[in-house]
């Protein structure tokens, strides 16, 4: 009998696909390390007190003496207060304005002017020059005005204190101050003319006798030369200004005679010579 066919082998079940492996979970994030707590700063070491550490700090010493603040100088008294007004320090005088700042240059206190140097020290008993003008301050520092006698000479300081030069009219008289400011006396030549200043400095006009000779000064003070009429009388002044007297002399080819007083002889006879109304020998 036929052999029964071998049944086909039962199919092997497929191997089931391997179960998917679960993915590895992402590692849990590590907690951030907390920032390290800041270390407390080391406290600054206390400076060693000058004295024993147990003593409290001494209060600040008050300012005394000169202090420069914002470019200005101030002076503080020993009690710490700021000085104002006049201050004597190390032999010099200083002036502190109302705000305490040290003054320099001209300062008016009351009716008087004073001058403080760049250092602040007051000038005294001296001549000094400011902006090409000369000034004088006395021993108290006060600016001089009017007449000033200095080292035997006289000077005149105008109302604003500057030294006068040239002609000065004062109380009705004229005076001449030389270029260096000293008052002229005696003969002075100014702009080509001669003038005579009396011993007190006043300019002479009219007749003046100097060293035994007579001179005539015009109304403007200038010395006359040549013919001069004073009143009704004529006189003759030489080129030097000296008046001729008791002599015959010749001018422009004419002869004239003047007597002992210098007066020109007219309409008369002198030494047998006749002179006419003009004084000319005829």
What feature does the model see in each segment?
Residues 1-282:
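Extracellular adhesion/carbohydrate-binding repeat motifs centered on closely spaced tryptophans
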